[in-house]
UniProtKB/Swiss-Prot annotation:
Pathway: Secondary metabolite biosynthesis. Keywords: Copper, Glycoprotein, Metal-binding, Oxidoreductase, Repeat, Signal. This is Oxidoreductase tpcJ. Glycans are attached at N63, N107, N113, N240, N283, N471, N601. The gene is tpcJ.
Amino acid sequence: MITVIKWLVSGCCALAAVTTRAPLPKDCRNTPNSRGCWKDGFDILTDYTDPKRAPPGKLVEYNLTVSQQVIAPDGYEKLGMVANGQFPGPTIEADWGDTIRISVYNNFTDNNNGSAIHWHGLRQFENNVQDGVPGVTQCPSKPGETQVYEFRATQYGTSWYHSHFSLQCECPLNGLFGPIVIHGPSSMDWDEDLGPWLLHDWYHDDVFSLLWVGETKNRGAIPESTILNGKGKFDCNHHNDTRCTGTGGEYFEVNFRKGVRYKFTIANTGTLLEYMFWIDGHNLTVIAADFVPIEPYVTDVVNVAMGQRYEIIVEANADFTHGSNFWIYAQYCDEVDLLPHKAVGIVRYDEQDRQDPRTPPLSDQHRDFGCEDPDLDNLVPVVQQSVGRRVNRMEMKDYLRMGQEGYPDPMNFDGDLHKWVLGDVPMFVDWKNPSLKKLAVDEHPDFPPETVPILLDFDTGDWVHFVITNNYTFEKVHFPRNLTPVMHPMHLHGHDFAILAQGRGEFDPSIVPKLDNPPRRDVVNVDTGSYVWIAFQVNNPGAWLLHCHIAFHVSSGLSLQFIEQPKKVKPLMEAAGVLGEFHDRCAKWTEYYDSVNIPDNHTIDDSGI
């Protein structure tokens, strides 16, 4: 057994990442019975939290053309946004340590949309300019323009890419997203990889009409369907709409063989709904949360909030008493009967047996499971890391309080229109003047209040702590008040964060945080009436977004940005040789935007991200 290294905390110093697993042979190879191995000198025990310790890799190149076309994933035709004509878009695939170069051509010539692609969960270490957030890390690319993103895969696991350009392209509302797979070691052995399973809610209506539903009625618009890997079912029998094709779509299907250990990653790429996910008749062994390998734990159901990913192993050992076909389920965690179809796919042990699986009655467990993240005790990182003392303030006035306020008058709670906030004001960005432009040009950058900046001008290795609250029961005490009791999956760009505490009710400052190897991930669900205490190291200069991954909420302003080590940003961009291209894109976008939008009096209808 390897010796556990524990470094003493002195002030705010960073602590070493360690592991208590037995070391692996130096010459081991990645096989079905040794998935913890990878390449010479690199395995599941390697400290991937240090981006500079990634294995040597190769250059992997992809070309994506983003455009509009009619799609019907659930049997109902709508105008959607696709990558290379595919929905979901093609898989971006590489090995841990590879450099990934992706050329994105904006072919939105028919709707005048800009484009910017975010690579969800990838840290972009010392490479903020590649994060793909318009108004924060870049100006959008105009129609007819190609933008080249290039970054190193310093983490491994499965995630996804998606547009971050306003609600017009946001997430799966219109379809512009696809999977990212970074191959690496696993914390448990498996036989066959089934790849990414992208799960999301699907809407038929115009996206901005849906946003107005949430901002005026204080309740998110209900989706028509649930889609798994681009396939779903919608009942056309009760609709005379000619866009309903009559076939009602199709289920996602996968074939199992008895005794085989299958690995896949379930990712919620959705807009509004957090899903309970399970496969009838099978247990799920969870081996990673987001991009963090964890000690395996067994469950029969897992909640997946928007933006979250869980790497799962399923052993094909089902009981055939009631047949050899089994439903794959995804239901909304809060209202189990909200959507007509809970079944989203089929596992078949016999390809020739085309019957639908038996549908057992919904158990009390599946009705009352709730919307909380997995217990923190289950999310134990394989590579351990202890959290140091904070260097920032964490008084009650510093809490990041989620809620709604009146708009345009924030004190008019009884008006028709409301915006979401994470603190004092809803976030709005300027596509022509992103935060990174200020950091790269201005000696003393000035950030408007509506860009919601939080300055992290600390030394490399310092730890910062934040409390995020979603306690709607205190609407008469705290400002802003939350008119809508709903969970919020909070996603941080540029970092994994440690979860030091999570619970219901008002946050108590006397709570003892979990500092010794707490769970780490990049999306945490802050359930209704709850709080979460997170921490991360200051080590990645740039402007990094923290936002709710409910598309309607981020579009309505529920975001902020951390301005991290601002004086180091410009030197990093100069060293990378990207300043010229960065400014050139902004100049082209400004000229294009002014020529197209100002004459027609078009303005940004939402936060811009």
